[in-house]
Amino acid sequence: MPDEFSQCLVTNSRMAARAITRRYDGYLRPFGLTATQLSLLGGLRELAGATVSEIADNRGFDRTTLTRNLDRLEAMGLVISTHPAHGNGRIAEITEKGDALIEQLLPLWRKAQADMKNELSRDAFDQSLNVLKRLAKV
């Protein structure tokens, strides 16, 4: 009887996510960032003025992971946090230093993307990305 769990979408998606994250983390390690943190910085750049909850929803982070990484980025001077004048929550914004780091890392991120495309093939990369985007909406 074949191992039914080897066909488990959860198991395989987690294994793939960890492998891809390790690959991207390797590119970013010399800069003291992780792929998760770079993704978060990119989200802050795109969603200027958004609350932590909005960022979590947009980027697929759970609040604990998001808060932990925001705190680290804030300690590095890449992010500042404020509280809105009205209502609850926390607003995180990218600093000039954080924005400059993104600009510095974009060529490296593009290289990581290109390396993955070359390893998978452009078609497989594009198909994988489309499937992942669909799965994120399940």
Describe the predicted segments one by one.
Residues 49, 124-138:
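A short beta-strand-loop micro-motif that forms or neighbors metal/cofactor-
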Residues 8, 12, 58, 65, ...:
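Alpha-helical initiation/capping and key positions within long helical/coiled-coil segments
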Residues 26, 30, 46, 72, ...:
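Conserved amphipathic alpha-helical interaction elements at protein-protein interfaces in regulatory
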Residues 21, 71-130:
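Charged, amphipathic alpha-helical coiled-coil/dimerization segments
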Residues 5-23, 97, 108, 131-135:
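C-terminal ligand-sensing/allosteric alpha-helical core of TetR-family HTH transcriptional regulators
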Residues 12, 37-43, 51-54, 69-75, ...:
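Residue-level recognition of specific faces of alpha-helices
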Residues 2-7, 114:
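A short, mixed-charge helix-start or loop-turn motif at secondary-structure junctions
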Residues 2-3, 14, 18, 22-65, ...:
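N-terminal helix-turn-helix DNA-binding core of bacterial DNA-binding proteins
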